[in-house]
């Protein structure tokens, strides 16, 4: 199986791991790692143990970095998920219902700008009265 991805001017071919040990992934962090034998910089925000304010700040910080970066060798991956305790007020759904609209507003305010890859819980879910994050991501790429 062979594949390739072209996203925002960045081209990744199958078999792009850093080396035989794979992609180095930091736990609960925003970090940079190399892939494609060091030719691509993977910028990742995966602070999943944080609560709303800190998580939204981390997501917005990586969006701002992606927006101002024209280097096609930098790939941005932004996870909007938060680990939850399982209760109704501390659930994945509850976090997504607050984080997704907030980030959708930020993407809309940024206009036509590079966002990188956003990994979203409840993508496309219609939060009443709020902009849809999927539509805003697509519109930012037009």
Locations of regions flagged by a protein language model:
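Catalytic cores of phosphodiester-bond hydrolases, prominently lipid phosphodiesterases
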Residues: 1-142
